[in-house]
Amino acid sequence: MNALVDQLKSTAAASKATDIRAAFAADPKRFSRFSASFDDLLMDYSKTAVNDEILTLLEKLATEGGVAAKREEMFSGVAINFTEDRAVLHTALRNRSNTPVLVDGKDVMPDVNGVLAAMGKFADGIRSGTLKGATGKAITDVINIGIGGSDLGPVMATLALAPFHDGPRSYFVSNIDGAHIADILKLVSPETTLFIIASKTFTTIETMTNAQTARNFIAKALGEAAVQHHFAAVSTALDKVAAFGIDSARVFGFWDWVGGRYSIWSAIGLPLMIAVGPENFGKFLDGAHAMDNHFRKAPFKENLPMLLGLIGFYHRNVLGYTTRAILPYDQRLSRFPAYLQQLDMESNGKGVTIDGTPVEGNSGPVVWGEPGTNGQHAFYQLIHQGTSIIPAEFMIAANGFEPDLRHQHELLIANCLAQSEALMKGRTFEEAKAQLTSKGMDDKKADFIAPHRVFTGNRPSITFVYDKLTPFALGRLIALYEHRVFVEGVLFRINSFDQWGVELGKELATGLLPVVEGKESAAGHDSSTQGLVAALSKLEK
């Protein structure tokens, strides 16, 4: 595989593949040759530095890297998360065909469907008012308490599908900072609030600390007996959940073959289901399942996750780009960049290969972003004229949900397309100078000012276009990026499904708590940590 990477590097250099502007000038049909569609979802990658030769080499790279074989292992329940000896089967959670999926010889689909049915029954009960609070009032507010995958997915998807909300209001608490839960509790009434505690082990310190605060909120206002009417849990630790005071009928489980950052499809999606209803949640699963089938069956040049993953690898390990910007032109996708940040960086932020040797080249990039057009007035300046090349990924729907605001949506579309065009085309010195002199500036001053108005262009971008951000479309988009991360992880030769860096942070925080509380000396820690503990201790009131 290293030989192919070297060949890609030499081919990119020899063909001047990074001159995207010249490629468009030479080929009027470039868009049609370097774009692909799956139903209404269009992926335009013509503004990246690829050509026919590079695509052929990338296809060989996927073959030599064993992407197809590893893909089938994942879908069939092989324990590809070998450091934890676990299968990776978030795809089973949205397996709408109900084709058997075996883990250790057992079909998991009956259990998956059983939990989904229980979620639907509970969600319907809350939404209809059949399941009430302790005083007999209907639930009007749902607060999900979780962190990481137990928070980012539900937050992102619930916000994204706001036009489909017809259930109780939704809130989310994640940070152990007491300000987070305090600010939200001010907005709700104990009598009409349901808390969902999302923690597989029911031991996550941030989640359980906030859960205890929520429990105190209910018990203080309504009494201990009210707790069972105002809480539900997504967990597998039934004994701990029972000790907390949550009825077993309100506990929804999931499995160790579901990673946190892939868990929105599981019972972790309960707050989303309550917000939009079981039918729309089912359409959300349908969209992801459709992308799963596309990923498994579509030929290379039509396979969106395969193309996206290979171009991502090409940007990272051939052209050396260290970061990628996620730029959805949809305010309701405002948390999508953060969601992808966890999905990508927690999965592919690894330095050791599946053989236990150091990664050669690079692993995952830094992933970040904001919705357009907000980002245009913040960091786009650096993307356009900075010294680092940052591949951008735009997303735009053809239609919004506010027909009376169609003109605003057209402005949004125009801004999105203009940014991708500007990144590719740039502006030469001659063009900049001509623009200045046409406005009356003299030649000498124009020569001085024009360099500041030069844009080098050749900044790569990918643009996704789709009809409308429906539950189906959102599920499809998330699954597309999940599979993109998978493809890149296989090519990086890493395990994309563990997260030992996260575990390290938990261990160290647990060890430091007694020091922060003043129960133990800081002497065993480095001088910086000792100094910081002392400074904070001095400021405590």
Curated annotation (Swiss-Prot):
What the entry lists under PROSITE patterns is as follows: P_GLUCOSE_ISOMERASE_1, P_GLUCOSE_ISOMERASE_2, P_GLUCOSE_ISOMERASE_3
UniProt entry keywords in alphabetical sequence: Cytoplasm, Gluconeogenesis, Glycolysis, Isomerase
Task: Give the CC-aspect GO terms.
Answer: cytosol
Q: SUPFAM superfamilies recorded for this chain?
A: SIS domain (SSF53697)
Please give the coiled-coil regions recorded for this protein.
none
Catalytic residues (positions)? E346, H377, K506
Pathway membership, UniProt? Carbohydrate biosynthesis; gluconeogenesis; Carbohydrate degradation; glycolysis; D-glyceraldehyde 3-phosphate and glycerone phosphate from D-glucose: step 2/4
Q: What is its EC number?
A: 5.3.1.9
* Superkingdom of origin: Bacteria
Q: Into which family does the record put it?
A: Belongs to the GPI family.
Please describe what this protein does.
Catalyzes the reversible isomerization of glucose-6-phosphate to fructose-6-phosphate.
Instruction: Tell me what this protein is called.
Output: Glucose-6-phosphate isomerase
Q: Which organism is it from?
A: Rhizobium rhizogenes (strain K84 / ATCC BAA-868)
